Regions:
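Short beta-strand-loop/turn "lid" adjacent to the catalytic site in phosphate-handling enzymes
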Residues: 80-130, 149-151, 157-168
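Glycine-rich phosphate-binding loops at beta-strand->alpha-helix junctions
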Residues: 325-348
Length: 400
């Protein structure tokens, strides 16, 4: 296979859901085209459609419907070739599959081989929601794009660092070893990007806290630009509540639910049917804020618990670091929600943080400091997880 060793590499980034497939094609860090296959109901039957999104933001619905999602990879390859994005002169250099899975193996990035599938089988029990889709995506990619390296991108790699001070659980060593347990963390691609972007923007401080607030939510504390503490653990369920996750709860509740519902259903309940959705009936923070403003008690309770969770974790990490010099907000809620940022920072004035009349981020600047002049900085910095994964995949291929 021809490779782009000395020119911009071309990568296909996969996002395999339980009933959807997204294919994002990148030339270097620039997304040139994406395809999104999703299911719809039509005359009582499930059909699958595909939307093409081009670099200029224009969208086109493919004039075709399919009976199964299994055709997505074959159809995606045909569409990319027809559009001229992939051909003999512009071959794919690699296919990237993000893996949200625990264990030492998945704390690093790997070119897929037989060992990868063995390791996926090991973590299926602790991650029944993500692993099946990931496994399906990898198998379809290797079959459809024969000869192209498929790379599993760890969602904890950037957090796997000797600077971490919170990787252990207080469990018997033999149990930890047998089940390969640890506080691996998640959202690593976002934090990895931030660890490069913050100093690049000249914003690095001694003690910083980065709040990744999106559909999933986590917080990581950085000391000298390296991870010291992170809120997620063996799985993304530990830590903050989020759109559909409980966040940390009494483990006995998890055990009880597992006994009553079965382990897989209990894990699904705590990951997909809890959090903001369970409390407020919506997993959309905008709807929850609107509901709280209209005196909807459930929405107000959900919003308050969410804010208290973030503030509490910031306080915990600040205490562990002996202070905090700057706070960063990123991901969808962190970047876009002025009410969320305001509610959080209003509780942190005792730490030296105050917001001015918060402004929406001017993306042309690359970041915004939304703090008062006499406050420690509060930055809003857009994340770019794909850019980080592409960088790390390129390094892996160059060094193989």
């Amino acid at each position: 296979m021809v490779t782009n060793s000395n020119i911009t590499k071309i990568f296909l980034v996969l996002n395999s859901g339980s009933s959807s497939e997204k294919f994002s094609l990148y030339e270097g860090e620039d997304e040139v085209c994406s395809l999104y296959f999703e299911g719809i109901e039509e005359a009582g039957k499930k059909k699958f459609i595909c939307t093409i999104t081009r670099a200029d933001g224009s969208e086109e619905l493919v004039n075709k419907k399919w009976d199964s999602l299994d055709v997505a990879f074959k159809e995606a390859k045909a569409i990319f070739e027809k559009e001229g994005f992939i051909n003999d002169a512009h071959p794919l250099d690699g296919i990237l599959v993000r893996v949200v899975a625990a264990g030492k193996y998945f704390s690093a990035n790997h070119i897929v081989d037989e060992q990868t599938f063995k390791e996926l089988e090991k973590v299926r029990v602790t991650n029944p929601l993500h692993v099946p889709g990931t496994e399906r995506g990898i198998k379809n990619a290797t079959e459809t794009f024969a000869g192209v390296p498929v790379i599993v991108m760890s969602d904890s790699e950037a957090l796997t660092n000797e600077s971490r001070r919170d990787t252990a659980y207080a469990l018997p060593k033999e149990i930890v070893s047998e089940f390969d347990l640890g506080r691996w963390g998640a959202h690593g691609a976002s934090y990895g990007y931030m660890m490069g972007r913050i100093p690049e923007l000249g914003l690095l401080e001694k003690k910083m806290i980065v709040c990744h607030l999106g559909s999933g939510c986590s917080i990581t504390a950085l000391v000298d630009g390296k991870p010291a503490y992170t809120s997620m653990g063996e799985t993304p369920l530990e830590g903050l509540m989020s759109s559909t996750r409980t966040g940390s709860i009494d483990p006995t509740i998890g055990a009880l639910l597992g006994e009553k519902l079965g382990a897989a259903e209990a894990i699904k309940l705590m990951n997909k049917q809890s959090g903001l959705l369970a409390m407020a009936g919506s997993n959309d923070m905008r709807e929850i804020i609107a509901g709280a403003e209209e005196d909807n008690e459930d929405a107000a309770a959900a919003f308050d618990l969410f804010i208290d969770g973030v503030v509490g974790k910031i306080g915990e990490f600040a205490a562990k670091m002996g202070g905090v010099d700057a706070i960063v907000f990123t991901a969808t809620i962190g970047e876009r929600s002025i009410p969320v940022r305001s509610a959080i920072i209003s509780k942190l004035e005792f730490m030296g943080f105050k917001l001015k009349n918060d402004i929406k981020l001017d993306k042309s600047a690359g970041y915004a400091n939304v703090a008062e002049d006499d406050s420690k900085p509060v930055y809003v910095i857009p994340t770019n997880e794909a850019a980080y994964m592409i960088k790390k995949a390129g390094e892996l291929l160059d060094n193989k």
